[in-house]
From Swiss-Prot:
<feature type="compositionally biased region" description="Polar residues">
    <location>
        <begin position="43"/>
        <end position="69"/>
    </location>
</feature>
<feature type="compositionally biased region" description="Polar residues">
    <location>
        <begin position="109"/>
        <end position="124"/>
    </location>
</feature>
<feature type="region of interest" description="Disordered">
    <location>
        <begin position="390"/>
        <end position="466"/>
    </location>
</feature>
<feature type="domain" description="EF-hand">
    <location>
        <begin position="697"/>
        <end position="732"/>
    </location>
</feature>
<feature type="region of interest" description="Disordered">
    <location>
        <begin position="321"/>
        <end position="362"/>
    </location>
</feature>
<dbReference type="GO" id="GO:0006897">
    <property type="term" value="P:endocytosis"/>
</dbReference>
<feature type="compositionally biased region" description="Basic and acidic residues">
    <location>
        <begin position="70"/>
        <end position="83"/>
    </location>
</feature>
<feature type="domain" description="EH">
    <location>
        <begin position="663"/>
        <end position="753"/>
    </location>
</feature>
<dbReference type="GO" id="GO:0005886">
    <property type="term" value="C:plasma membrane"/>
</dbReference>
<dbReference type="InterPro" id="IPR011992">
    <property type="entry name" value="EF-hand-dom_pair"/>
</dbReference>
<feature type="compositionally biased region" description="Acidic residues">
    <location>
        <begin position="340"/>
        <end position="350"/>
    </location>
</feature>
<dbReference type="Pfam" id="PF12763">
    <property type="entry name" value="EH"/>
</dbReference>
<feature type="region of interest" description="Disordered">
    <location>
        <begin position="187"/>
        <end position="206"/>
    </location>
</feature>
<dbReference type="GO" id="GO:0005509">
    <property type="term" value="F:calcium ion binding"/>
</dbReference>
<protein>
    <recommendedName>
        <fullName>Increased rDNA silencing protein 4</fullName>
    </recommendedName>
</protein>
<dbReference type="GO" id="GO:0005737">
    <property type="term" value="C:cytoplasm"/>
</dbReference>
<feature type="compositionally biased region" description="Polar residues">
    <location>
        <begin position="187"/>
        <end position="204"/>
    </location>
</feature>
Amino acid sequence: MASNNSTSQLAALAAFKAINNKKNEESQPNNRSRIPLKVDTTAPPQTQMKALNSATRAKSSNKISQTQADKTRGQTSERKDQKTTPTGSNMTNIFKMPNTPKTPKISKSAETPNSVGASRRSSTYSNSFAVESLENEPPKNDNFGEPLSTVNNLERRKTVSQHSLNYDPQDMIRNVKNSIGSKYISNDLSPGQVNTKRLSTGTQPKDMLDSVRNSINSKTKTNSKNQEMSQRNALILNGIRDSIDSKRISSHHDNSTISLPLAEERDKILKSISKSNNPEEQLMLYGQPIYNYSSSSFASSFSENDNDQLRTPVIIRTDMDLLDPDSNASIQHDERENYSNEDDDFEYNDTYDTKEDKEVSPINIPLSSHACARLGISNNDTPKTFMNLRIQTPDKEDSSRLKPKRKPPPEMDNDSISPTFTEQSDGYQTEGDDRMSDASSNRTRRHSVQYNDYGGYSDASSKSQIKVNDDSDYSYFDESDLSGSETPSVEKIDNDKSFLDDRLPIFPDIKAKSRKLFRNRKSKPIYNSDDPDTSKSDLQSATEELKNISVPSRTSTPVMGHQSQPVQLKATMRTNKKREKKYSFNENKPWKNHSELSYIAESERKRYEGLWVSNKGLYINCAVSRFIGVDYNGKPEIESQIENQDAPTTAALLSSRTTNEDNSNVVQQNFHNLLSAETSQLIHGVVVKRIWKRSRLPKETLEAIWDLVDFRKDGTLNKPEFLVGMWLVDQCLYGRKLPKKVDGTVWNSLGNVGLNVVLKKKGRR
């Protein structure tokens, strides 16, 4: 019964379905699409008719795109769809019609004629679905809460439908053209005009060529202007050099040879350099290429952007101008007063005075003989100008004043000192420190004592000397040391000795002196109690008589004679590494070793000499100014005389040269090559500046180092000056401060700078 009822219900549903389809086709227009609804299987069978119709329409509308693919694929796709249909209990049940002869089979793969028609209708009316949905929606409110007008909504919906239906490519092209025209209007340009920022299609190739030609012509005009300016500058430089050459040639010295090239040669060189595209030729200075390519040489890295032209370094100078001898003497006197203090000699300044308002000017080069002839200065005045170049060094008295004074020893109390007498073979010996009659007499005594050739000290102020004992312990007395107005004679002292020999006790021999720093100074006299002739009262009377005789103290005079020390042989072959490590120089802590701070070490000197050898004599021949001590005419007079004379005469000339150099000023001038110098043994200031700049020290410190080292005052340095300057740069990098003046020990540590002898140690190979 249940099966019969179900079949009857299904048949009724199919009949109602066909009737409703006909009614809907007649009543609804063609331009409307139906809204799909979901099928609810839980509803009673009477209400499932409408749901079934809506479900079939929705399924057909969603599978419009799949129908074309199904036609090509065939039945294989339909079989796959049947296999992949969900059959789970949780999924919604799809209603299937029973297989009856009256009703067709309803399944996912089989399509009824009605469903096909519905799919066609949905495909034709799918474009108007959005319009229908918008018309059915109620009017919405705008952003301010007011309802929008229905007329505007309808117009907007119609425009949306029209834009959705316009798929013609010609319409798309028109829209693009309209957008381009709107851009021209926004930029205030008509469509026929050309924008300067971008080339439009309307520009012709002739116009493009004309614009390119105009740009090229404008660039050539600017280049021609630059060339004219460079030619003008070159002409100005040539005029300056010609004026210098003419002034030098017009002087009365006909034998002078000029090492500078002529103006015509310079013009040729400059033209060849300007025309050549080779960068190596453009680095040449006055047409002379750089041949030094060593890594340690300065010439390998000479070209820089900041300073391409060769010129003397600009140095701040305070008191470097040529002054009169009287003014030089006053300056020298002021410097001595500044260095008269004891503490200032060996302390470095905490701050180096750098004034911004100092005048920055090139180095003033002293007048040469040619310049003196041009200015009309007589030859008698020229030596005065060279005398001003004399190095001002303190005298011996000032140097003694500069040395540190040792603190005098503390004065001993009078009561704490008591003499002790001992008796040996033929005399007596005193031990302990005795006082002088007065402190002033002690000081005069200390200065007047002089050392004898025979191993003793003598007094220069007194005439008579008295020797008390002939043994190893020497003691000399003069008249001022003896108390009282009467001067005792030698015979009287001999009588006193015989008196003392009878009364004083005999002491045992002293084997060795005690070398303790704090020995017992209050030692009581030792006497022999077995001797019946001696007594304490006799000893006291003897000591009172000899107290008046003042013995020179050991603090004022050194110990006489040479004390033999026992020879200690080395017991092991080990070295004391702790001691060597303690006293060795530590670069990380240079302030802990003060013994090597006042002279240049051998390793440092070799390192600086390597820089000197690779950079000496560079670009000196290219300089315009003359240098001090360089003979541009030929060889010096003394060397020419030595070459022309015989062997005995040359030896005499050399010996006379050594005797003349005893003067301190002459020695200093020879040390700094002020009298005679070779260009190959000088280094230019530009090279020194570039080398010192690599240390990255401040500019003020480098200028101060140059002022301390520069004695030539012509923009060059010789070998010792360059070595000391490099040493000062290293000391600044270590953390030391620059001194007011370079100590003489630093200059003396260089020794014979010209000699470089390597001694090989003889040993096993």
